[in-house]
């Protein structure tokens, strides 16, 4: 029998439980066999012969605090996102974002070495699931942007931005910020990049989310958006300049009326799915305490 206080800590998906187990096992392996770190973590100087660590580096944590935080965050965010995206797309998102994040970290570390000639950038071990977690925050921003987060009283669309601001601010007071800050920044950007341009939409057979509400400038305050938009437009044209016109042809009819697969319609449909999934989760968690209460009352009557 589940108690009311524990209902919110149940109903995690099987996929998220499996991924959480991978994180825990990965942490135990590097703790009991430290010699495996150079083979699993991303160490830029050794990445060329050990190219697989562009993948493995994201699936284990070097610290106990890291594995606890990553496991708990994965379970709760996956509990919401996986039903909306589907298990296959959720797993694909994690794999692609993790790989692209550590690929960018590798390139950045090599560039910093050639600029500064400091070997610390070549031999610093990069590892952890926090890049993917940053990307998952972007997924929450996309699906329920205007939903207020309980206790925090802030809208979900600002979660990635607040996380980055706090991480950058804390980097001035910590010595190991280089080990996590690039991963968080690239994880956030790669999560947005994947959802913006790559994620397949089964309803429309198109890819990505080109709606204005999910533009890159929405990560910034409105005061800065006139400056950010022209810069973002350059990268947008580089990524999908030719396909943009094709997408518009599919999204709009000749009369200018939006079709079912248009940007605004798809964005609204995605938010409705997210809100419905959130309501179902909350409804399930409320149903369990109510059911337990009815069972207790029934047991009491039987005893009488």
UniProtKB/Swiss-Prot annotation:
Pfam families: DUF1751. SUPFAM superfamilies: Rhomboid-like. InterPro entries: Rhomboid-like_sf, TMEM115/Pdh1/Rbl19. It is a multi-pass membrane protein. It is found in: Membrane. Its main location: membrane. The keyword Transmembrane helix applies. Keywords: Membrane, Transmembrane, Transmembrane helix. The chain crosses the membrane at residues 23-43, 58-78, 93-113, 120-140, 158-175, 179-198. One of its GO terms (biological process) is retrograde vesicle-mediated transport, Golgi to endoplasmic reticulum. It comes from the Eukaryota. GO terms for cellular component: Golgi apparatus; Golgi trans cisterna; membrane. SMART domains: DUF1751 (SM01160). Residues 247-304 are annotated as: Disordered. Residues 266-284 have a biased composition (Basic and acidic residues). Coiled coil: none annotated. Probable rhomboid-type serine protease that catalyzes intramembrane proteolysis. Belongs to the peptidase S54 family. This is Rhomboid-like protein 19. It comes from Arabidopsis thaliana. The lineage of its organism: Eukaryota, Viridiplantae, Streptophyta, Embryophyta, Tracheophyta. The gene is RBL19.
